[in-house]
Amino acid sequence: MRAVAIFIVTLLVLECVYFVMSEPDPGQPWQVKAGRPPCYSIPCRKHDECRVGSCSRCNNGLWGDRTCR
């Protein structure tokens, strides 16, 4: 009887872990509009090259990727 109880508890624990580790459902399309402005893909070396749209500076610092921001 003890073995059956341990087996059932183990199955319940595994099911809880599976539920917690599963990925959430994707959001509605109207919620997934987080995107970067088109000027983020413009390569640059100086701030003057990035006066386009909402971008105003060049991300050319030590850890920068040399694109407009």
Swiss-Prot record:
<feature type="signal peptide">
    <location>
        <begin position="1"/>
        <end position="23"/>
    </location>
</feature>
<keyword id="KW-0044">Antibiotic</keyword>
<keyword id="KW-0929">Antimicrobial</keyword>
<keyword id="KW-0732">Signal</keyword>
<dbReference type="GO" id="GO:0005576">
    <property type="term" value="C:extracellular region"/>
</dbReference>
<keyword id="KW-0964">Secreted</keyword>
<protein>
    <recommendedName>
        <fullName>Antimicrobial peptide ISAMP</fullName>
    </recommendedName>
</protein>
<dbReference type="GO" id="GO:0042742">
    <property type="term" value="P:defense response to bacterium"/>
</dbReference>
<comment type="function">
    <text>Has antimicrobial activity against B.cereus (MIC=5.8 ug/ml), B.subtilis (MIC=12.3 ug/ml), S.aureus (MIC=10.4 ug/ml), E.coli Edl 933 (MIC=3.2 ug/ml) and E.coli MG/655 (MIC=4.2 ug/ml). Non-hemolytic.</text>
</comment>
